[in-house]
Each structure stands twice: as structure tokens, then as C-alpha cells.
């Protein structure tokens, strides 16, 4: 590739990896570039990579690496860096997700609303997110392919693998959630096991304080319906050698340090300081910054409790850990015999005895196990002694074996706690495994880890290549000749038999005399010509392998020791004989063939190879998804991006390998619209009159003489380097055009300057001639003027002398006249002031006199009226006592008294028990109130005393002031007496001193008074609060008394001769139902409870006799007419719902509202609920909203309370009190005079009105929710402009030969049509405008929320052209709102504030000139800084190519967002939907117009019923009196 001057490139730099540069000079074999670090560098062309010249136009970053113009290392690196600076931590590379650890909390990305947004969304449709990958795996497993899936999470220590795994499991539980046993989900149980696994499997390394030293594969199992049915955890390659050997500054496993810091538990196991144990003191790092070992110990114990490990097993686990530590402190010295050993000293013997005690085994057997081994032969058992080194190795082998078995036991128990589904056929596995490792010193663990990563990389390469093939197939292009990049040769080098590195290592381990030198020699001899294996220069045993991520040098010093995993028979026999069931359970008895040999060799590498093989088989049977976690810096700080470290991780994570696979095929893919929009300037003649983008693309490529490109169905595929050729040609054309424009512009500027200079010279000449002429004329005019001036000066001097004389005379006269006038005016003013004072004083006297007379008159009138009222009250009482009705009732009650004795006795008992409990409560309240009242009285008395003192001091101060005034006046009057004057001065000084003392006392008194008043206010507040509680109790008590009064009336009016046996039970049920005892079941929110749920029904025998006397019960058999009215659509007459009017007329005629007990209201409510539950309920919702609201309006206006439910308190208690209060004053809501009769409402009627109100709210809520469901698909389409619209707008903006086409608003027209249809439906059903206004307002609020949230979640929507498209759609909604008027639309336009301001921000020009204050206050006042920051980070100008908000504003917003993130618990930038009911009962009463039901006739379909013939005989039925 040739480079020209001015071309933007990437140049490699040691510290930064890659830096931006610009070509300054291009030579034959070298290129001189000027880097962003202001350095001139001369490099060869092969070391340069092209950079996109338009990288800043799209916001400087893309959310998918495949969208990069140049897919190369620096492009990937800097794209991640720019997105990380904007807190965009997720980025796609095809189907691979790259997650950069933010090292800060971002809760808005992981709340439940965000999970709901990504549910069921195709991968890549929304912004990159780990939830998108999890949803893709779930959708393919459960919906599309019915095939198990796997998610591979990899990265180095501290990159966020574990947190990402938690988020994946959290999302999978959300979409396939199952409530597991003990009220814990599977995800919770797996996460609760994390602290336990971290304690026993994590340790501090050089790079990470909490590094996982094992691999983990979590398999979540699903049933056929997609619900989670179980889970399992598998672990790989625990770093056992860390138990016995660590290096500084690393640590051993966390559990050892936690146990040593456990306090009493540590003393119980005879543990001391960490530094006293050999397995822990090999490193000087004992504590972790920000971590308390003791606290972590108790967290681990709590995790064991959660997982289900018993207390006995917990004690055994920690005893085993303590025994391992004591085991490490056992030291050996040479014994008496050759090659033998024994315990060194008493300290070692103490640790030996302690370890044996903790293992619960024989100490002598432990000594013999450590210092010797037995060999079984035909002749017998031969015991061979071990030397010191062998005994220490035997000790370490025992410690590693015990710890490994303990770890496996923990994993097994965790799996048992979670629960596995063996019948599950669909699984989603989440692999959290260590990433590629390359340190200064790399040992056997790094070799195994990198071997596993090579295996996974091969699987990854195959998957990426497969994805490439699938895209090529979908685009129908030829791809058969593309080569596949494979790393099979590295895998053969490591694992191939019989001469692979692992095979050679196992062979060396089987020979006791083999060393790492013999192993290295044999390896170099077998692989001397292998391209991937190298021998290091300065070591005979170290070797280097060229992995996919780079070269790694391994030190073989400890390869053999770490690979040997002997199963020592003595170890198994020792611990299987332990008296502790837990320890003996870890070591089962060995088979016969194992007993014959003391050492049974087992290769760690071979076993890991088999585990890895099983894992790869599992992964191959699933469809993989990849998440690559990246650690941006080694300091674990937010907003710090280290290029070199990230680049190394990208290479190790296989991301750049995926880039290389893409480069092997067609790395550059562009849609035809994007390609034509970018490169149409190369062949402008093709743009004239042509709209076939594919043909234009082909013409451009053929014109540029490019080969090996492919034209797919929707995209053009270019080989590596071809896009650079096109960009160079495009840059040349644009440069030529720029030079041409500059030349024309310079010509224009030069001519303009020439014309301006010529006009200036002409102006200067004219000005000079004018100056000369004006100078000559001025001389002549001055000569003539001198004569005239002299004449006028002489005249002026004479005139001035005359005027001075006249002015002097006038001044003397005016002074004299003024003096006379002022003296006269002073006399008049004094006289007038005296008159005003006299008149004011007389008026004041008469006003005071009048007020006294008026108060006396009012008092007399009040007394007289009170006297008259008392007389009238006595008359009324006497008349009431003499009423015959009372005497008749008294006679009837006396006759029935004997029959009701038993029932009343029971009622008294129930009543007495309830009153007793209430009286006790009231007495308690009264005592509290009395005590507080006493305190209040004491405080008031104290305040009064202070106030009296204050008045006394004030009076003394006034007296002192009067004395001072008098003394001062005497001083003035007796100025001649000097001695008296001095005495008065002394007296004044003493009085002033006394005055100051009194003022100080007054200030102190005021302060104490203020304190007392504050305390008094606090006491009064408490007293008021208690008084309110007492009022509430009194209200409840009064309501219960009223209800009891109703029940008592019923009891008095019922014959009981034949029902005494069942009366006690019935009354108890009725009483419990009336006062709301716990027996009654709570109702759901949207159910409409019937009145009989509150009034318990009486026995059939009682109700039969009662029915014969109440009018409503005589008509109860005719409730079918009401059911017919409800089930049929009776339509409307003159805008009035016929069904509601007919139902109200029937209930009014049958006196249902005056009945104390009836079931007819139950039938009405239940019938309405049944209609709303039917199959056609959605279509009838507007009809029933109109009918129920009309019926509720009639009840509200025509029912009144009979005074039964009035309470003595000012405030009504509960819902019943509110209804009673409403019914007591129905005229409050009526704007006209009461022409309709008011009916006295009883308790069932009041409850019926309450249930009808709930029914109206239910219908409104169902209708609103249905509308939201219907409009949601339309909104999902409207948020983004159609592809054809975007392509045409782009071509119109950059191609001169093509005119712009108007944007298609068909999707928005669908929304307008939907709203028109909704308005027509609501108007056809005569729904009140109040409901229409509330419904439309909430619907537009939902539109605002959906459009705004979609805008923030989809980057392709945050463009200039898309903003214009959405703005045009919003203008259609504005026109619709204007057309329907405010009566129906209300504040709907205001509800669209968020989306209007966001779209307005997208389409403004010159965004870089806007400050943060202008954006917050002028452009987006309703939006939060987090929302504005989200829009700015996603915005890009796809139409004009302009830049977005300035970097200073973005940095300021990022700082504010980070600061808010630390303070807020939930700081999502998305909006929440409003599901509340936006009106109350009072709103309905005031908003719904009154209805005259008199002129509504009975429909013909109902006229044959006999029970409604009265509706045909009378037009306006009146209730019978």
C-alpha cells in the first residue's frame, strides 16, 4: 500500500502500543510520520496501519468491531478506549461480547427494567450488553433450535469474570425463573455458594487479590417449558501445590488466614499467628487491604449454613484445615539408620500430636506414615524408611491430598444443596475459567492453564469461522477458498501421544530417578525441529512455546513434582481409620491391587487433559457464546485505560485472533446504502437518475478496477486493503475539490480587496477636495462674522446691565412677598392640625363607644336566641315523648322481649367482651393523655410564670424610662442649678446601669421563655398526635356501634320462635363479619366485592319470614331482568346509557336502596364482573365504562345518608366514613337545583356504590392496559426511520444530482389512525370526556416512555436523520392533539416532554458550541444529566458528518454521573411506566355531568317482563313513601 502526505495512520509505539499519526513525507522504502505525541518517526511502510479519516463523525466509536472501516489491532484498541471513556463497557465483535471492567458501580445497567428491555430482542438490535448474550443463548435453547447452549467467560484475574457470570445467571433466572426450595432461586443458591468456593479456592496473586485458582463450569438445567429445573457446578484444576508452596507477595488460600484470625475458634484448634506456620509464612503478605480476615471467617460460616452444611461438618472442616497447618510445621532430622528420619524436636512433636488429635487418628501411625512406606510382596510386607527430604515430600503430599479431597467434598455438597435435574435435556452452561497467563516465571500451573486456553481457542476459532460462513451463506457469496486459521500443531505438541509434552512428562514421572533435566533433554531431542517449541538461550531446562497469544517461557524446575499425584496407601489407611466420620468419609478404602503398592502414581496433567476433553465434548454438543472480559488497568481504578495491558489481553483472549480470521476472508462489510453514501463521489455520473444501490456499488468498484470483491444480498464484501484504496482515491478527489474551492475562494477574496481599495482611493480624493473648498469658504465667513460679532457684543453688554438692575428689583420684591406668604401659611397649617387632632380624637371616642354597644347587643341577642332555642328543644322533647309511635314500638318490644332474651344475652356477651377490650385500650390512652396533659399544664404554667416575670421586668423598664425622661426634662428646666444638675447626672448614670441590668435580665428571660415555648409546642404536638389517635379509635368505635345498631334493629324485627337453636351461631358470624375479624379473606385489587361479603346472611328460615315484609325481597325473584340488561347491549338514547338508567329505575322502584338487607346488589356486581371476564370483554370495555360511570353518577347525586353513619369526629373513619360523608351532602357536587328526589340510603346501598366505584376503576385499568399492548408494536417500528428513508436522505445530502425525497411517515400514520379509531370508539359509546382525557393522557405518557427508552437503548436511533424522522412523527401527534381539542387531549402534549426534548437535542446544529448549562436549562430541562450523557455518548451525525458535544462538556457530565453513581441506590436513565388510576371518587362526582333518566324508555326486548311493567305506566317513577 502506498502512503501519501496527509494520510492518517497508526504507528506502533512501545509504551502505548499504537498511537495516532499523520504522514509527513513518503519515501521509497520509508515513511516519515508525525505522531500525536508530537514526534517525527521514520518507519517502514509495513509497520503502518491505515486509520479511518472520518472516525470522529460517528461519535468516534462503533458498538460492533465489524463496523470499523479498518479492522485492525489499533482500530479495535482505540474503539474500546473511546467507549470506555463514555462508560460504554460492552462492545461486540460479531457475536463475541467484550466486557471492560469499569471498577465502579453501574446499577442502571443491571436493574430489572433493563432485563425486561433485552428480553426476546435479537442480538445486536440494542446496545451491547451481557444480557443480550444471555438472552440469545436462552432464546436459541428454548425457542429456536431446542439445543443446549454454553457461554464461555474468560479473561485475566480482575477482569470481572465472576461478576459477569453472576449477571448471566441473574438474567437466566429472570427469564426462566423458578422459585426453588426454601424460597431461594437457583441463581441465589449458586451465588450464595460463591463466598464458600472463594474462601477455599481463591488466593492472592501478583495481579489480583482475589484470584480464582480453579476453573468453574455452572450448568443451569431447564425443563421442556423453559423453566429452570436444576443446576450443577463443576470445577477444574485446583492449584493444589499452593497449599504447601507459595512465593512472596502471594498468599495461600483465604480459608487458612480466616481460620487463624477467628479468635476463640483458632484457640480451640491451637492455632497461633500466621507467621508461625510454615505453609503461610513463606510470604510476607498476611493481610489484604480493605479485608478483615475475622469478618470473612464469619461470612464463610454463614455461607456454609446457607448451603446446608451441618455444624458438625463445619467443625470437622475447620479441624481439617487446622490439622493441615500443624502438619506443615512438622520437621524431620536424620535417624539412627541410614536414609531414615525422625521428628526433629519437641515443637515438631507438639504439632504432630495436635495434627493427630485434629485428624482423630493414632499419632504413632501418623509418624510411621510420614517417615516410612510399606511394600507388599509375596513373602510379606517390607517397611522402608524415608530420608528427611522424602519424609517432607510425603508430608506435603498428604497435606495436598487432604485439601483436594476437602474441596471436592464442598463442591459435591453444594451441588446437592442446589439440586440437579437428571431428566433435563436442555442446559445452558456458563464457563468461568482462567485466562491465558504469561508471567516472568511460568511453572506447571501456567502450562496447564495455557493448554486449556489453546483448546478453548481452537473451539473459538472454529466458532468464529462458522459464524463467518453463516454470514457468507446468508448473503449468498462464494467463500469456499477462504483458509481457516488453526492451532492444532500446538495442541499436538502438548497432548499428542506418544511423544507429546504431557506424555513425556508422565513418562519421566514414572521413573523415580528422573529429573527435570532429563525431561527437558528428552523433550528437546524429540521436538528439535518443531516450529512452535524453542530452547531458551541462558537455560538448559527452560523451553518456550509459541501460543496463539504469544510466546511463553516455562521453567521446568518443579514440573515433575507438581505433576506427580501419588495415591499413597498409607495416607488412605491412616485417614480412613480416623474416628471422625467426616475425615474417614473423605478417604474410602483402596482396592486390593492398590494395597500391594505403597505409591499409586497418578498424573495431574493427564487427569486435567481428560477433564478438559470432557469439557470440550460438552462444549461441542452445545452452541457457544463468548464473553471476553478485559481489565483496563492494573491499579483497579475507574476511567484509567492502559493501552499496552489491554492490547495484551486482547491477544490472549483471542479477540485479535478473531480479527485475523475475519481478515482472512472479507473483513470489510458495508450495506449498499452506507457504501454509496461514502464513495459516491468517486463516480458521480452513476448517481444521476439511479436508485439501484447494488448496481451503483458494482459500478463504483468496477470503475476503481478492484477485484475479488463480493456482492451479497444486502452488503458488499471487500478484501483486506481494498477499503484503504477506495479511501485514498476518495481523499484525493476530496483534496482536489478542496483545492479547487480554495482557489475560487482566494480569487473572490482578492477581487473583493481590489474593489474595496479602489472605492477607498476615490473616497479619499473627494474628501481632500472638499477639505480645501471648506477651508477657503471658512476664511471668508470668518471675516464677515467678525463685524457682526462686534455689533452684537456691544448690544449684549448694554442689555446685560439693564437686565441686572431689573432682576435685583424683582428679587427684593419676591423675598418680601414670600416672607409674608410663609407666615400666613404657618398660621393656617397650625389651625388645620389642631382641627384634625380634635376630629380624630372625637371619632375614636365614638368608635369605642359603638363597639362596646355592638358587643353588648350581640351578647344579648345570643342569650335571647339561646333561650328561645332551649324552649323549642324542650317542646320537641315533650312532643317526642308523647308520640304514639314510640308507645306502639314499646308495646311490641315488650311482647317480643321474652323471645329475644337468649339472643340478646349472647349479643351482650359478645358486645361486653369487645367493649371491655376497647375500654381497656381507651383507659390506657386516657392515662397517657392525662399524663401528657399534666405535663402540658405544667409547661403552660411555667410559661405563664415566665411571661409574668417578663411583664414585671418590662414594667420596671418602662418606669425607669419614665424616670429618665422626667430627669432629663428637669435637667433642661433647671440648667441654672449646677449642684442639682450634677446630682441628676449621677442619678441618670445609676438608672442607666440599672436599665442595662434589667435589659440583660429581659434577654435571658426571653431566651428561657422561647425554650419553654418550644418545649410546650413539642408537648402540644405529642398531645395532638395522641388526640388524633384517640379520635380515630372513637371513629372506629362509633362505626362499630352504628353497625351493631343495624344488627340490633334486625334482631328486634325478626321473629325467633322457631329459630332459637341457630340464632347464636348466626349472630356470631354476623358480628365477626361486621367488625372485620381475621376470618374474612382479603380481596384482590381489581375484584369488586359484593355487599353480602360484609353483611353475613341470616339462616334460610329467618330470611323467609323477613322477605315477606320487605318490598325489595318481594321483587328479588325478578332479578333476571337486571341480568338481561347487563348481558345485552341496549345502546344509548340521546347520549344516555339505556342499561344504566333501566337498572337504576328498577332498583329505585323496588326500594333496594332503602332496604337494610338485600342480595340484589350482589347479582348486579357479579353479572358485570362476568361480562368483563368473557371472551368479548375487550370490545365491550368502552360500553361498560360509560354505563358504570353513569350508574355511579346517578347513585352519587340521588342517594343520601339517613344519619346512621354520622360520627362525632370531624374526620370520617375509613372508606365507610367517606361514603357516608359524601352521601350526607350530595348537593355539593351538583351544579343545579335538586329536581330529582333524594333517597335515604341504607348500608347495602352504600357498599354497592363503593363496589361500583371499584368496578369503574377496574374497567378503566383494563382498557388502558389493552391500549398499551396494541400500540407497543407500532411504537417499536416508529422509533427508527426505515432503511430506505435513511439511504435517500444520505444521498440527497451528498449528491448534487439527486433530489431529496420526503421521509415516509406511514408508521406514524398508523399511530394516528389508531388514535382516531380509539376516539371514534369512545365517542360512539358516549364515554364522558373526563375518562377520555385521562385515558389519552396516560396513553401519551406511555408513548413518551416507550420512545424515550428505545432511543436510549439503540445507538442507531441517536442520529441526526433519525431525529428528524421522529420529530416529523411527533408533529403529526401534535396536530392530532390540536384537532381533538383540550377537552379530550388535556395535557397529552406535555406528557411527551422527554422524547420531544431528546429529539430536539438530536436535530440542533452546532452542538459543540453548546455549554452544559444551555443544554440543561434551555434544550433539555426535563432530562437528567445521566440521560443527557447517555444521548451524547450514543449520538452521531449520519447526514452532515458534524461533530457532537465538545469533550469538555462530556467530561463534566461524566464527572457528575460518576459522583451521582456513588450516592444513588438506583440510578437508571430509563423511565418507569405509570400504572396508577389517575382519579378518585370525588373527581368522578365533580367531573361527570348529571343524567336525567326520566325520559329513557324501556326497550322492546324487555317489555314482556311483568316485573318492569311499571316502567311502561310511568315516565318518572317516584319512590313509594
UniProtKB/Swiss-Prot annotation:
Tissue expression as described in the entry: High expression in kernels and stems, intermediate in ears and leaves, and low in roots, silks and tassels.
GO cellular component: a single term: membrane
Record-annotated disulphide pairs: none
Main localization (coarse): cytoplasm
Region entry Actin-binding, spans: 493-527, 529-552, 587-612, 612-634
Record domain Myosin N-terminal SH3-like: where: 4-53
Coiled-coil ranges (or none): 870-910, 974-1050
Subcellular localization(s) per the UniProt record: Cytoplasm
Null mutant phenotype: Dilated endoplasmic reticulum, small and misshapen protein bodies, and opaque endosperm.
One Pfam match: DIL
Keyword entries, A-Z: Actin-binding, ATP-binding, Calmodulin-binding, Coiled coil, Cytoplasm, Motor protein, Myosin, Nucleotide-binding, Repeat
Every Myosin motor domain range: 60-731
SMART domains xref list: DIL (SM01132), IQ (SM00015), MYSc (SM00242)
Domain notes per entry: IQ domain mediates interaction with calmodulin.
Subunit structure: Interacts (via C-terminus) with HIP (via C-terminus), but not with zeins, FL1 or intrinsic proteins of protein bodies.
Family to which this protein belongs: Belongs to the TRAFAC class myosin-kinesin ATPase superfamily. Myosin family. Plant myosin class XI subfamily.
Its biological purpose: Myosin XI motor protein required for endoplasmic reticulum motility and protein body formation. May function by binding with its tail domain to receptor proteins on membranes and exerting force with its N-terminal motor domain against actin filaments, thereby transporting its cargo along polarized actin cables.
Protein name: Protein OPAQUE1
Amino acid at each position: 500500500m502506498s502512503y501519501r502526505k496527509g494520510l492518517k495512520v497508526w504507528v506502533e509505539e512501545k509504551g502505548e502500543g499504537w498511537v495516532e499519526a499523520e504522514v509527513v513525507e513518503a519515501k521509497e522504502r520509508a515513511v516519515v510520520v508525525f505522531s500525536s505525541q508530537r514526534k517525527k518517526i521514520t518507519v517502514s511502510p509495513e509497520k503502518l496501519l491505515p486509520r479511518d479519516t472520518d472516525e470522529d463523525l460517528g461519535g468516534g466509536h462503533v458498538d460492533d468491531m465489524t463496523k470499523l472501516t479498518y479492522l485492525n489491532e489499533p482500530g479495535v484498541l482505540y474503539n474500546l478506549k473511546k467507549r470506555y471513556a463514555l462508560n460504554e463497557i460492552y462492545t461486540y465483535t460479531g457475536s463475541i461480547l467484550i466486557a471492560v471492567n469499569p471498577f465502579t458501580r453501574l446499577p442502571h445497567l443491571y436493574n430489572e427494567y433493563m432485563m425486561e428491555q433485552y428480553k426476546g430482542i435479537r442480538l445486536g438490535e440494542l446496545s451491547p450488553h451481557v444480557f443480550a448474550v444471555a438472552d440469545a443463548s436462552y432464546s436459541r435453547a428454548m425457542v429456536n433450535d431446542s439445543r443446549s447452549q454454553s457461554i464461555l467467560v474468560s479473561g485475566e484475574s480482575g477482569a470481572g469474570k465472576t461478576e459477569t457470570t453472576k449477571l448471566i445467571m441473574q438474567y437466566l433466572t429472570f427469564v426462566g425463573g423458578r422459585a426453588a426450595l426454601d424460597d431461594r432461586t437457583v441463581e441465589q443458591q449458586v451465588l450464595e455458594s460463591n463466598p464458600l468456593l472463594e474462601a477455599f479456592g481463591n488466593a492472592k496473586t501478583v495481579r489480583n487479590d482475589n484470584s480464582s485458582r480453579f476453573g468453574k463450569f455452572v450448568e443451569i438445567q431447564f425443563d421442556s417449558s423453559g423453566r429452570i429445573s436444576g443446576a450443577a457446578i463443576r470445577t477444574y484444576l485446583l492449584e493444589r501445590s499452593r497449599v504447601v508452596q507459595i512465593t512472596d507477595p502471594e498468599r495461600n488460600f483465604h480459608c487458612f488466614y480466616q481460620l487463624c484470625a477467628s479468635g476463640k475458634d483458632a484457640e480451640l484448634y491451637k492455632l497461633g499467628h500466621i507467621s508461625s506456620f510454615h505453609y503461610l509464612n513463606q510470604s510476607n503478605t498476611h493481610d489484604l487491604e480493605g479485608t478483615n480476615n475475622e469478618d470473612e471467617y464469619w461470612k464463610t460460616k454463614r455461607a456454609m449454613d446457607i448451603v446446608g452444611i451441618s455444624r458438625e461438618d463445619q467443625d470437622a472442616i475447620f479441624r481439617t484445615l487446622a490439622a493441615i497447618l500443624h502438619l506443615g510445621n512438622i520437621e524431620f532430622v536424620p535417624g539412627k539408620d541410614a536414609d531414615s528420619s525422625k521428628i526433629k524436636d519437641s515443637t515438631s512433636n507438639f504439632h504432630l500430636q495436635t495434627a493427630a488429635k485434629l485428624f482423630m487418628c493414632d499419632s504413632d501411625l501418623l509418624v510411621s506414615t510420614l517417615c516410612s512406606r510399606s511394600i507388599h510382596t509375596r513373602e510379606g510386607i517390607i517397611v522402608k524408611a524415608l530420608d528427611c527430604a522424602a519424609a517432607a515430600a510425603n508430608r506435603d503430599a498428604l497435606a495436598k491430598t487432604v485439601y483436594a479431597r476437602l474441596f471436592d467434598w464442598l463442591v459435591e455438597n453444594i451441588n446437592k444443596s442446589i439440586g440437579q435435574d437428571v431428566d433435563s435435556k436442555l442446559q445452558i452452561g456458563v464457563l468461568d475459567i482462567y485466562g491465558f497467563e504469561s508471567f516472568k516465571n511460568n511453572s506447571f500451573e501456567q502450562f496447564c492453564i495455557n493448554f486449556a486456553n489453546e483448546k478453548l481457542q481452537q473451539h473459538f476459532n472454529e466458532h468464529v469461522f462458522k459464524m463467518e460462513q453463516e454470514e457468507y451463506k446468508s448473503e449468498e457469496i462464494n467463500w469456499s477458498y477462504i483458509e481457516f486459521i488453526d492451532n492444532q500443531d500446538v495442541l499436538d505438541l502438548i497432548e499428542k501421544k506418544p511423544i507429546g509434552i504431557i506424555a513425556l512428562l508422565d513418562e519421566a514421572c514414572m521413573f523415580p530417578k528422573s529429573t527435570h533435566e532429563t525431561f527437558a533433554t528428552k523433550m528437546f531431542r524429540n521436538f528439535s525441529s518443531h516450529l512452535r517449541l524453542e530452547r531458551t538461550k541462558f537455560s538448559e531446562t527452560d523451553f518456550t512455546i509459541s501460543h496463539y497469544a504469544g510466546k511463553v517461557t516455562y521453567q521446568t524446575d518443579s514440573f515433575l513434582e507438581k505433576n506427580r499425584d501419588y495415591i499413597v496407601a498409607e495416607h488412605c489407611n491412616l485417614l480412613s481409620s480416623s474416628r471422625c466420620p467426616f475425615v474417614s468419609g473423605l478417604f474410602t478404602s483402596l482396592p486390593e491391587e492398590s494395597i500391594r503398592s505403597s505409591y499409586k502414581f497418578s498424573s495431574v496433567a493427564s487427569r486435567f487433559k481428560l477433564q478438559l476433553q470432557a469439557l470440550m465434548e460438552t462444549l461441542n454438543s452445545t452452541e457457544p457464546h463468548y464473553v471476553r472480559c478485559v481489565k483496563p488497568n492494573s491499579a483497579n481504578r475507574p476511567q484509567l485505560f492502559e493501552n499496552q495491558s489491554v492490547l495484551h489481553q486482547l491477544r490472549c483472549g483471542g479477540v485479535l485472533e478473531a480479527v485475523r480470521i475475519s481478515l482472512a476472508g472479507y473483513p470489510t462489510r458495508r450495506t449498499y446504502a452506507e457504501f454509496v453514501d461514502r464513495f459516491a463521489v468517486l463516480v458521480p455520473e452513476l448517481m444521476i437518475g439511479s436508485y439501484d444501490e447494488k448496481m451503483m456499488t458494482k459500478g463504483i468498484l468496477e470503475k476503481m478496477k478492484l477485484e475479488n470483491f463480493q456482492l451479497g444480498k444486502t452488503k458488499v464484501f471487500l478484501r483486506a486493503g481494498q477499503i484503504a484504496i477506495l479511501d485514498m482515491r476518495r481523499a484525493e478527489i476530496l483534496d482536489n475539490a478542496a483545492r479547487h474551492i480554495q482557489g475560487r475562494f482566494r480569487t473572490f477574496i482578492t477581487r473583493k480587496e481590489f474593489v474595496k481599495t479602489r472605492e477607498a482611493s476615490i473616497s479619499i480624493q473627494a474628501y481632500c477636495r472638499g477639505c480645501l473648498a471648506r477651508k477657503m469658504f471658512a476664511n471668508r465667513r470668518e471675516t464677515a462674522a467678525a463685524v457682526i460679532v462686534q455689533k452684537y457684543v456691544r448690544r449684549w453688554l448694554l442689555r446685560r446691565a439693564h437686565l441686572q438692575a431689573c432682576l435685583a428689583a424683582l428679587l427684593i420684591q419676591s423675598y418680601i412677598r414670600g416672607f409674608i406668604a410663609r407666615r400666613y401659611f404657618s398660621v393656617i397649617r397650625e389651625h388645620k392640625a389642631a382641627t384634625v387632632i380634635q376630629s380624630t380624637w372625637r371619632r375614636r371616642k365614638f368608635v369605642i363607644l359603638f363597639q362596646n354597644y355592638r358587643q353588648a347587643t350581640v351578647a344579648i341577642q345570643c342569650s335571647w336566641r339561646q333561650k328561645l332555642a332551649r324552649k323549642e328543644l324542650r317542646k320537641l322533647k315533650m312532643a317526642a315523648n308523647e308520640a304514639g309511635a314510640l308507645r306502639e314500638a314499646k308495646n311490641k318490644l315488650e311482647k317480643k322481649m321474652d323471645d329475644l332474651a337468649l339472643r340478646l344475652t349472647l349479643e351482650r356477651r359478645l358486645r361486653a367482651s369487645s367493649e371491655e377490650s376497647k375500654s381497656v385500650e381507651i383507659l390506657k390512652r386516657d392515662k397517657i393523655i392525662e399524663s401528657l396533659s399534666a405535663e402540658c399544664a405544667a409547661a403552660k404554667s411555667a410559661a405563664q410564670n415566665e411571661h409574668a416575670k417578663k411583664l414585671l421586668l418590662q414594667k420596671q423598664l418602662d418606669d425607669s424610662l419614665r424616670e429618665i425622661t422626667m430627669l432629663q426634662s428637669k435637667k433642661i428646666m433647671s440648667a441654672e442649678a449646677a449642684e442639682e444638675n450634677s446630682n441628676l447626672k449621677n442619678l441618670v448614670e445609676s438608672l442607666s446601669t440599672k436599665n442595662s441590668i434589667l435589659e440583660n435580665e429581659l434577654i435571658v428571660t426571653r431566651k428561657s421563655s422561647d425554650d419553654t415555648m418550644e418545649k410546650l409546642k413539642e408537648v402540644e404536638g405529642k398531645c395532638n398526635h395522641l388526640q388524633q389517635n384517640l379520635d380515630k379509635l372513637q371513629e372506629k368505635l362509633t362505626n362499630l356501634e352504628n353497625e351493631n345498631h343495624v344488627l340490633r334493629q334486625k334482631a328486634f324485627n325478626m321473629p325467633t320462635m322457631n329459630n332459637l337453636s341457630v340464632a347464636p351461631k348466626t349472630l356470631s358470624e354476623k358480628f365477626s363479619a361486621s367488625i372485620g375479624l381475621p376470618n374474612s379473606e382479603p380481596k384482590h385489587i381489581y375484584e369488586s366485592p359484593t355487599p353480602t361479603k360484609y353483611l353475613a346472611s341470616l339462616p334460610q328460615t329467618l330470611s323467609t319470614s323477613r322477605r315477606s315484609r320487605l318490598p325489595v325481597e318481594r321483587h328479588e325473584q325478578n332479578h333476571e331482568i337486571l341480568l338481561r340488561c347487563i348481558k345485552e347491549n341496549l345502546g344509548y338514547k340521546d347520549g344516555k346509557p339505556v342499561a344504566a338508567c333501566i337498572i337504576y329505575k328498577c332498583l329505585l322502584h323496588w326500594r333496594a336502596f332503602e332496604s337494610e338487607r338485600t342480595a340484589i346488589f350482589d347479582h348486579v356486581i357479579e353479572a358485570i364482573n362476568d361480562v368483563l371476564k368473557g371472551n368479548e370483554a375487550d370490545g365491550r370495555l368502552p360500553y361498560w365504562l360509560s354505563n358504570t360511570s353513569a350508574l355511579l353518577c346517578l347513585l352519587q347525586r340521588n342517594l343520601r345518608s339517613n344519619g346512621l353513619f354520622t360520627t362525632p369526629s370531624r374526620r370520617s373513619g375509613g372508606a365507610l366514613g367517606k361514603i357516608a360523608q359524601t352521601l350526607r351532602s350530595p348537593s355539593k357536587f351538583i351544579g343545579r337545583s335538586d329536581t330529582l328526589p333524594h333517597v335515604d340510603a341504607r348500608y347495602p346501598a352504600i357498599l354497592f356504590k363503593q363496589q361500583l366505584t371499584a368496578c369503574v376503576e377496574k374497567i378503566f385499568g383494563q382498557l388502558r392496559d389493552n391500549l398499551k399492548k396494541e400500540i407497543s408494536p407500532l411504537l417499536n417500528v416508529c422509533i427508527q426511520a426505515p432503511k430506505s428513508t435513511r439511504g435517500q436522505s444520505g444521498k440527497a445530502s451528498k449528491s448534487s444530482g439527486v433530489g431529496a425525497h420526503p421521509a415516509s411517515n406511514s408508521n406514524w400514520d398508523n399511530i394516528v389512525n389508531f388514535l382516531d379509531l380509539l376516539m371514534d370508539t369512545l365517542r360512539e359509546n358516549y364515554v364522558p370526556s373526563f375518562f377520555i382525557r385521562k385515558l389519552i393522557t396516560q396513553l401519551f405518557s406511555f408513548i413518551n416512555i416507550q420512545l424515550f427508552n428505545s432511543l436510549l437503548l439503540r445507538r442507531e436511533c441517536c442520529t441526526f436523520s433519525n431525529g428528524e424522522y421522529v420529530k416529523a412523527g411527533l408533529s403529526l401527534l401534535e396536530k392530532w392533539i390540536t384537532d381533538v381539542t383540550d377537552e379530550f387531549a388535556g395535557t397529552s402534549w406535555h406528557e411527551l416532554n422527554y422524547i420531544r426534548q431528546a429529539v430536539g437535542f438530536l436535530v440542533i446544529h452546532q452542538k459543540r458550541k453548546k455549554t452544559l448549562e444551555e443544554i440543561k436549562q434551555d434544550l433539555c430541562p426535563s432530562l437528567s444529566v445521566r440521560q443527557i450523557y447517555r444521548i451524547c455518548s450514543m449520538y452521531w451525525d449520519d447526514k452532515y458528518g458534524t461533530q457532537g458535544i465538545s469533550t469538555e462538556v462530556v467530561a463534566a457530565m461524566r464527572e457528575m454521573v460518576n459522583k451521582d453513581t456513588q450516592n444513588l441506590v438506583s440510578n437508571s436513565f430509563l423511565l418507569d411506566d405509570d400504572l396508577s388510576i389517575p382519579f378518585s371518587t370525588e373527581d368522578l362526582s365533580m367531573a361527570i355531568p348529571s343524567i336525567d333518566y326520566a325520559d329513557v324508555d324501556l326497550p322492546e326486548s324487555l317489555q314482556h317482563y311483568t316485573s318492569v311493567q311499571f316502567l311502561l305506566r310511568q315516565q318518572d317513577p317516584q319512590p313509594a313513601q
